Amino acid sequence: MHPTEVTSYCWPHHARIEGAGSCRRTTCSTATDNRQYVLTCRCVSAGGFWRPFGHYQGRLGALVTISHRDTDTVFIDELRKTCESTNINFLLGAGCSMPEFGTLGNIETLWAQLKTSETKERIANEHGDHANLIENIIEASLKASFFETAILPNRDYIKTNTKETKENYELFCRAAMKLVAKREASTLPKQVTFFVSNYDICMDVALDMARIPTNSGYVGRFNPLVDLSDFGRRVTTSTLTLGYQSEIASANLVKIHGCASWRKKGGGIEFSNEFDLIEEIERNIDNLCQTAQQANPTQDPGLQGGLFPLNSNTFNELIEQATTHAHKFDSDSVNKLLDSFKKLQIVWPTKQKFHDTVLDEIYYAQLRRLTNQLEVRNSVLIVAGFSFADEHIRKLILRAADTNPTLKVIILCYNEQSERDIKENLLSECNTIPNDNVTTVTAMKPGTGHIQGNLDLNTVSTLLKMVSK
């Protein structure tokens, strides 16, 4: 029996349990209509308490079947069988790069509110001639917070002692590649595709450290350019005497949102290890703050180290902060900082991704590649460190799960709270997953299994090692 944790917003009345064993079916009707719906239930205690294996929502009786599993031996055996016979894909989010890199929190939500016509009208009415400055300060503040969380740590990632994160990524890459290294059937490639929603260089460094042949989307050695045709190439080795060829395990690396190391060059984008742009942006942030301090020597502690500490949880608080500090900033310095942000070749975490970036073509191509991979028969997408707050990726994955019944989406959740947040994000998008092919996974409680505690990247690596045995 596998314990099931499901958020059930509307568990219908008049439910009737049928069948026997650890898995039963429930026929039920709602109080608002007389239609009959069938839900799968599993026993969650020795006393025979039953709970719906999925999510029932609303009067129309739509059923969302998001399965839950624990990292017990049965799940590990099933995952082993899945990986032996499928095309393997991973989706890695910001949670994998902690503690060196932070998560973005509610920045995307605040950004979306800034761009609404209602917000622009409100700022214009309240601040008149200073409305543009207030709006620019808010945008610069959000981008500065994002920069310090997701971009700035890349500069020192290679040089400084970030041993824990580097080792975790390298161990993960090695464990993931072992899933395909011993494959003998030519119908399945010895290849793993890694989709990364982060902006960091952690996977780039880890694949190099593990010496894994990688299709990374870069062409050239001294000044590598981003070339999206450089994917899917399989690596083989052959003997000199007999000419026998065998495939070597290789990886595809897809940076969906771009990378902190990408730079504009002519009509293309190059990969650079110089990080000079990051240093330029950091200088502009520091100069802006120093200018504010010089103009206001009695500055209150609300301006420390950056434009705003962004400890505001709501947009109203953010507007209040911007209004309070507006007189401290020179508009030219704010605009200079915003111009330097535009040089970053990344897809900013806004809901208007398709409208405010020069990377539209690359972004579309990366999403198409993710779509194409998930449409392949007998594929699995293993997700780690990703909250599904990203609207575009969330919709894409749910659509693929709907149209491809042979696809399995396995979401490795950091802890139970993370699982609840992920389910909430998924259920906000749709009210049915008819193929029952989306599963959330949490680790066993301490003392109850081999994989226990929180499913961070290191624990995920341990899980994959057990799967590849």
Where are these regions (language model features)?
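Cysteine-centered motifs
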Residues: C10, C23, C28, C41-C43
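Residue-identity detector for glycine
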Residues: G19-G21, G47-G48, G54, G58-G61
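Gly/serine-rich nucleotide phosphate-binding loop at the start of the catalytic core
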Residues: Y56, G61-P224, S246-A249, V254-H257, ...
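SIR2/sirtuin-family catalytic core signature
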Residues: R59-F90, G243, N311-L337, L344, ...
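A short acidic (Asp/Glu
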Residues: P99-L104, M203-D208, K265-G267, E391-I397, ...
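Extended, H/D-rich, highly charged conserved domains that either
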Residues: V192-I346
